């Protein structure tokens, strides 16, 4: 799969284009006198060095672009790479099956767990079918149904957050979008099983929070978590979405800032260039963090789990 480079990655893109051209020439004529392999190796080293330099000094807006990268791994990619025997479950048993939320039972190193996550979709038809990862009320009600099932069978719950926000359409509001989100917040705080939440891309507002109340909250290195998108904030404060980069910096949407504010527990490092550069390595790091979190939570009693979760929620907003 050819990489899709963002605007700030254009110097890297130019180097990679040269590498591809030289590689293509080498394949066409293996009898060339010049040593193309040596030049390709030199350019690859230069590309890695340049990538490292650019990614060492990313701003919040650049991180937001990475969090939305079209090739970034989604929930089902991590399910495939980090879990076994996934059995998807569908429907909220009240209205419909919302494809923007996926969930089901899987095994993590042999242990049954309940997985719930946003799913955006890749191709145009799938994006539309999954509503670009923006759940309707039935999506959140499906998520809650699966959480309650996990509680009945004493299975840990693992959620993956990646949404621009809950769907704001008229139909969603008529079917009780705000009530569905509020109910999830309340019920997740009361669950008797461990809950681990990880932001893998965009963590957009209440749409993210509705599956984001947990005992452990993690973020991938180049993910974001905020009450509104940078464009939305800029449109309100400056009446122009063009001010989105300024808004992104002001809102503190990136993982280091959120960890500093004690809103998250861990930052999971991404491969050089972002998770989309090496999904397998990213999935391995994510899996290791989940196993570590489960080991920490397994030693706690049900009362301790719930008390810690409550204290965590009550601490939000205090310096």
Swiss-Prot record:
It is found in: Cytoplasm. It catalyses: N(6)-carboxybiotinyl-L-lysyl-[protein] + acetyl-CoA = N(6)-biotinyl-L-lysyl-[protein] + malonyl-CoA. Keywords: Antibiotic resistance, ATP-binding, Cytoplasm, Fatty acid biosynthesis, Fatty acid metabolism, Lipid biosynthesis, Lipid metabolism, Nucleotide-binding, Transferase. GO terms for biological process: fatty acid biosynthetic process; malonyl-CoA biosynthetic process; response to antibiotic. Residues 35-296 form the CoA carboxyltransferase C-terminal domain. The keyword Nucleotide-binding applies. It is an enzyme of class 2 (transferase). One of its GO terms (cellular component) is acetyl-CoA carboxylase complex. One of its GO terms (molecular function) is acetyl-CoA carboxylase activity. Changing residue 164 to L/Q/S/T: Resistance to polyketide antibiotic thailandamide. Pathway: Lipid metabolism; malonyl-CoA biosynthesis; malonyl-CoA from acetyl-CoA: step 1/1. It comes from the Bacteria. Transmembrane segments: none annotated. Its EC number is 2.1.3.15. Its main location: cytoplasm. Acetyl-CoA carboxylase is a heterohexamer composed of biotin carboxyl carrier protein (AccB), biotin carboxylase (AccC) and two subunits each of ACCase subunit alpha (AccA) and ACCase subunit beta (AccD). Belongs to the AccA family. Component of the acetyl coenzyme A carboxylase (ACC) complex. First, biotin carboxylase catalyzes the carboxylation of biotin on its carrier protein (BCCP) and then the CO(2) group is transferred by the carboxyltransferase to acetyl-CoA to form malonyl-CoA. This is Acetyl-coenzyme A carboxylase carboxyl transferase subunit alpha. The gene is accA.
């Amino acid at each position: 799969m050819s990489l899709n480079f963002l605007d700030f990655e254009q110097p890297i893109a130019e180097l990679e284009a040269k590498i591809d051209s030289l590689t293509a020439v080498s394949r066409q004529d293996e009898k060339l006198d010049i040593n193309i392999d040596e030049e390709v190796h030199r350019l690859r080293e230069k590309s890695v060095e340049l990538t490292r330099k650019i990614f060492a000094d990313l701003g919040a807006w650049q991180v937001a672009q990475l969090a939305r990268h079209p090739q970034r791994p989604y929930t089902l990619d991590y399910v495939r790479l980090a879990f076994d025997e996934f059995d998807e479950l569908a429907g909220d048993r009240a209205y419909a099956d919302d494809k923007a939320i996926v969930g089901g039972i899987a095994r993590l190193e042999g242990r049954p767990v309940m997985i719930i996550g946003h799913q955006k979709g890749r191709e145009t038809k799938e994006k539309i079918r999954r509503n670009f990862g923006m759940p309707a009320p039935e999506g959140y009600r499906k998520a809650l149904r699966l959480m309650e099932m996990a509680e009945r069978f004493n299975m840990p719950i693992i959620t993956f957050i990646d949404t621009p926000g809950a769907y704001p359409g008229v139909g969603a509001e008529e079917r009780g979008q705000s009530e569905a989100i509020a109910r999830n917040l309340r019920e997740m705080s009361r669950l008797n099983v461990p809950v681990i939440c990880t932001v893998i891309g965009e963590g957009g507002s209440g749409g993210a929070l509705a599956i984001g109340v947990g005992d452990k909250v993690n973020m991938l290195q180049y993910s974001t978590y905020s009450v509104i998108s940078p464009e939305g904030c800029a449109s309100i404060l400056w009446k122009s979405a063009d001010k989105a980069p300024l808004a992104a910096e002001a809102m503190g949407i990136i993982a280091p800032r959120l960890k500093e504010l004690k809103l998250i527990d861990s930052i999971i490092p991404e491969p050089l260039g972002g998770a989309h550069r090496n999904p397998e390595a990213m999935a391995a790091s994510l899996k290791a963090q989940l196993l570590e979190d489960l080991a920490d939570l397994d030693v706690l009693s049900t009362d301790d789990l719930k008390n810690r979760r409550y204290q965590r929620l009550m601490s939000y907003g205090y310096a």
